[in-house]
């Protein structure tokens, strides 16, 4: 996708960029009712997730992460914007008359044909088990548990790589750099997720963040002592501690958050932090 640059006509467009989008008519049976941004508050109105609130109303698009229409060819009819994710989505018309949304693979265009199954070609947009893929294949929408649907490598520009197959397991390198084992019976989609340059987009104005449901982030050092451990002092005072902390007093940098005996630990060959 092309990134369009705004001319500096007004402060709101200063250094702003816009991703070129393809808009089209939406499938009514694939869209569920109002889907509001998370406000970050519980039933009592207490903030449980900071920096969230507001945002434009959204309609939820039902995405087919399972790709369980086996051996039925489908054609890409539209490439659409989805407000619920960074990646674009594309509408598929199958030969049996059914319509579904899938994540838009990079390089796929309107009119391309896709299919899922066990004996299909290695082509962008096709979905098949890892047993049928050659080593070095770039994939996305990867299952962790067979039949549960794709859970890994679904963000815009995400791509995983199949690097080895041995026994009942396949070794994959994930977008985070983590190398882990996954059952060879799990399915994945060939190719990379589209909308690769989304991380280079500049919103250009604070209001654009509010449309996305994101509230301002305030530094703890400018707060009062009652609000943050870093707060207080006269003028630009230091935080007054040896190490930075969260608003609740826990270490902010370097604290491990993953459980040591998590069930999936035995499947990880190399952690994403150890590269």
Swiss-Prot record:
List locations, semicolon-separated.
Answer: Plastid
**Which Gene Ontology CC terms are recorded?**
mitochondrial large ribosomal subunit; plastid
> Which keywords accompany this UniProt record?
Plastid, Ribonucleoprotein, Ribosomal protein
Provide the residue span(s) of the region labelled Disordered.
Answer: 225-249
Top-level taxon of origin: Eukaryota
The UniProt entry, under Gene3D superfamilies, shows:
2.30.30.30, Nucleic acid-binding proteins, Ribosomal protein L2, domain 3
**GO BP, sorted A to Z:** mitochondrial translation
A Pfam family reported for this protein in Swiss-Prot or TrEMBL? Ribosomal_L2
Question: Where does this chain mainly localize?
Answer: plastid
Q: Which GO terms describe its molecular function?
A: RNA binding; structural constituent of ribosome; transferase activity
Q: Which HAMAP family match?
A: Ribosomal_uL2_B
Assembly notes? Part of the 50S ribosomal subunit.
PANTHER family given in the database record:
LARGE RIBOSOMAL SUBUNIT PROTEIN UL2M, RIBOSOMAL PROTEIN L2
Member of which family? Belongs to the universal ribosomal protein uL2 family.
Q: What is this protein called?
A: Large ribosomal subunit protein uL2c
Q: Which organism is it from?
A: Cuscuta reflexa (Southern Asian dodder)
């Amino acid at each position: 996708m092309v990134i369009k640059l705004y001319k500096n006509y007004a402060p709101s467009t200063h250094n702003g960029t816009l991703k070129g989008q393809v808009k089209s008519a939406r499938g009514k049976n694939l869209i569920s009712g109002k889907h509001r941004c998370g406000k970050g508050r519980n039933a009592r109105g207490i903030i449980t997730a900071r920096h969230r609130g507001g945002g434009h109303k959204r309609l939820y698009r039902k995405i087919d992460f399972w790709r369980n229409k086996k051996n039925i060819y489908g054609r890409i009819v539209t490439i659409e914007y989805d407000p619920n994710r960074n990646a674009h989505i594309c509408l598929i018309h199958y030969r049996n008359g059914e319509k579904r949304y899938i994540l838009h693979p990079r390089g796929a265009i309107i009119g391309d044909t896709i299919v899922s199954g066990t004996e299909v070609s290695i082509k962008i947009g096709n979905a098949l088990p890892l047993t049928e893929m050659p080593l070095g294949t770039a994939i996305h929408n990867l299952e962790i548990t067979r039949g549960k649907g794709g859970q890994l490598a679904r963000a815009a520009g995400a791509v995983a790589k199949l690097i080895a197959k041995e026994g009942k397991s396949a070794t994959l390198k994930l977008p985070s750099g983590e190398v882990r084992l996954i059952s060879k019976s799990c399915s994945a989609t060939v190719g990379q997720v589209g909308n690769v340059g989304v991380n280079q987009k500049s919103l250009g104005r604070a209001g654009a963040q509010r449309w996305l449901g994101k509230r301002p982030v305030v530094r703890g050092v400018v707060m009062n002592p009652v609000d943050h451990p870093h707060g207080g002092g006269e003028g630009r005072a230091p935080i007054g501690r040896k190490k930075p902390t969260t608003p609740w007093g826990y270490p902010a940098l370097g604290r491990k958050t993953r459980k040591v005996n998590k069930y999936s630990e035995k499947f990880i060959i190399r952690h994403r932090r150890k590269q």
